[in-house]
Amino acid sequence: MSSNSVVYWGTGRRKTSVARVRLVPGNGTITINGRPGDNYLNYNPAYIAAVKAPLETLGLGTEYDILVNVHGGGLTGQSGAIKQGAARALCELSADNRKPLKTEGHLSRDPRAKERRKYGLKKARKAPQFSKR
């Protein structure tokens, strides 16, 4: 990457994961925390497809490299955070990209998170065994 090349930034969040995504003109390689993307995501096709989805929606799969710093959570949350961060970076690239990305749902934050444990219960909703006597 040359020092004068254009870089587009986007931040994504999912569950407890936070991803800072940079889009750089290139050939479509994905680098996550300094490792190749498919290696970092354990070669799981669902995670890899989720990361590439925003670029594929716009047909830019081989035009930009994705460089990511991500922390927190597991691979599901991290891949979702990277997807949202890449979509936000593509919106920064051009305002025309926003509508198709929004239609496909790449820009919306998934609000689902782990439910808190309540006192008197073993887990969030699991109650101790009921005894009549």
UniProtKB/Swiss-Prot annotation:
What the entry lists under InterPro entries is as follows: Ribosomal_Su5_D2-typ_SF (IPR020568), Ribosomal_uS9 (IPR000754), Ribosomal_uS9_bac/plastid (IPR023035), Ribosomal_uS9_CS (IPR020574), Ribsml_uS5_D2-typ_fold_subgr (IPR014721)
Q: Where is this region: Disordered?
A: 98-133
Q: Which Pfam families match?
A: Ribosomal_S9
Which regions are flagged for Basic residues bias? Answer: 114-133
GO CC terms in record? cytosolic small ribosomal subunit
Biased-composition ranges, Basic and acidic residues, are 98-113
- Molecular-function annotations in GO: RNA binding; structural constituent of ribosome
The UniProt keyword set, sorted, is: Ribonucleoprotein, Ribosomal protein
The GO annotation for biological process reads: translation
Protein family membership: Belongs to the universal ribosomal protein uS9 family.
The protein's name is: Small ribosomal subunit protein uS9
Task: Name its species.
Answer: Parasynechococcus marenigrum (strain WH8102)
